[in-house]
Amino acid sequence: PGMDDPALTGRLHTSDTIMRVEELPESLVILGGGFIAAEFAHVFSSFGTKVTVVNRSDRLLRREDALIAERYTDAAARHYTLRLNQHVVALEEGTHGRLRVVTEDADGVHYGFQGDLVLCAQGRVPNGARLRVDAAGVRMDAHGLVVVDEYQRTNVPGIWALGDVSNPYQLKHVANHEERVVQHNLLHPDDLVASDRRFVPPHGVFTDPQIASVGLTEDAARAAGHDVAVAVQEYASVAYGWALNDEGHCVKLVADRATKHLLGAHIIGPQATLLIQPVIQAMSTGVDVPTMARGQYWIHPALTEVIENALLSLGIEADA
């Protein structure tokens, strides 16, 4: 049955409707392995719901750096049930009023997972075509996004676009940045400013453990031809992490040896979205690795020392 089947009303949900349920379900099956699936799995399992996550690939959050995705998948398996490498083939009535998700693995074997509710969290696709902007001559790309230039202008004079309708990074802070760009450019047509697209925008995944990322993953940096330096620093290697009795959480930095600048940062662990902010600042302002590592004080015994040590572990020295 489809999402709009009346028989499924109140039992089959999207991320919009799942937040409006009046009672906590005893069991929930979540379809998908991205950040929406991960965050809702965290929320409902924390409340005591028996959560089963069904995902097509062999790990959750596969768009994250490979190390982070691997560690998160291992951590998630300790909190709720994972069914990986499964392709959903049917959704049918189960027992006792529950829904049954039927899946198939690579060998063609079928499985069934039941839940009081099912959350479809397999991602969102752009729906800009519903705006009918083509009637005004505005161009859209093959993915359904409105095409804009670096100043957020469309191909039609006087029409601007920002946020999810034109940017593949569907993040509130990205839309906020572009809103400021558009506001400035509307008020100052002779002094246009461009949106900052120098690196992959930062984002956070608010789960347990928390995740934060900015810029290129290691694989993407190598594929782009950079002279890559990588450092992985465990939380437990610094005093604050040791005091937390931390296990399995880390900071991963990716840098270019030739330019001495950071290319990306990926963190899994407590306060990841706070820890990553100084890295975002360094990447935004052009501070290189040696300057960031040794050009400031790092408070001891704060958790930020894990960033300091990761920078030093990159092995990138200042010019003599």
Language model feature labels by segment:
Residues 8-25, 112-192:
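FAD-site-proximal beta/loop scaffold in flavoenzymes
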Residues 1-3, 38-39, 44, 61, ...:
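Glycine/Thr-rich phosphate-binding loops of Rossmann-like dinucleotide-binding domains
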Residues 50, 81-82, 139, 227, ...:
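Residue-level detector of anion-binding/catalytic polar loops
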Residues 13, 81-83, 229-231:
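General small-molecule cofactor/ligand-binding pocket signal
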Residues 19-20, 25-29, 35-104, 108-109, ...:
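Rossmann-like dinucleotide-binding cores of NAD(P)H-dependent redox enzymes
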Residues 95, 142, 257-259:
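Short acidic-glycine loop/turn motifs at beta-strand connectors
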Residues 206-217, 222-320:
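Flexible, glycine-rich terminal cap/loop adjacent to redox cofactors
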